[in-house]
Amino acid sequence: MSNNIGSFWNKWDLHIHSPYTNMNNRYNCGIDLFCQTVKDKDIKVIGLTNYFIIQENEYNEVVAELGNDVYVIPNIEFRTNDTNGSGEYINIHVLFNPDNISIKAINDTLARIRLNNIASATAVYCSYESINSIGFDKVTISVDSLIAQLKSDFNPSDYLIIGVPNGYGGFHPNSKPRSVELAKKLDELSHAMFGRKEDTEFFLSTDNGRAQL
């Protein structure tokens, strides 16, 4: 029997923090109400986002509460060592394939990465216990170290790197050579971008030697 339904259009939100977020927590509700709101908005796929680490209990609770209504992708947001023209630390996101790797495997890999402690000389690694001991706002990560560890432990189909060109922590460059070179580097590393309609012209531009994407 032929299927004449045609295309399905589903709503995705790949950058959504839960009440378990490690920083900037403005929620006044629990996971149950958070998940109900997601379902009420008819969102079919979410990128469950947290800074540096997603703990197993957060992911498992959200998945259990959403059930089969919503597909949940772990999205870890990293504040990098690099800064943009406004002096803000640049953020990048890594989305992990939950069908291929577990939250434990993700966290075991990240825990091997030494972070930059911007507050003191104390060694800190990318694990919840280590970061929480000094504060999530006190650490940044080397992009090169992150990428090297991901490539060492995972297959290309296990994760996607998402760049953030605009907004707080975005890498949209000014005219300074270092800013342009940094934007080119993040262009090349990123599999996709969290962007706006207005970003199209920027990413199609070949100004300042940037390769057309």
Residue ranges and their predicted role:
Residues 1-30, 57, 112-213:
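Domain-core and long-helix interface of multi-subunit machines
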Residues 4-129, 133:
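A metal-dependent hydrolase metal-coordination microenvironment
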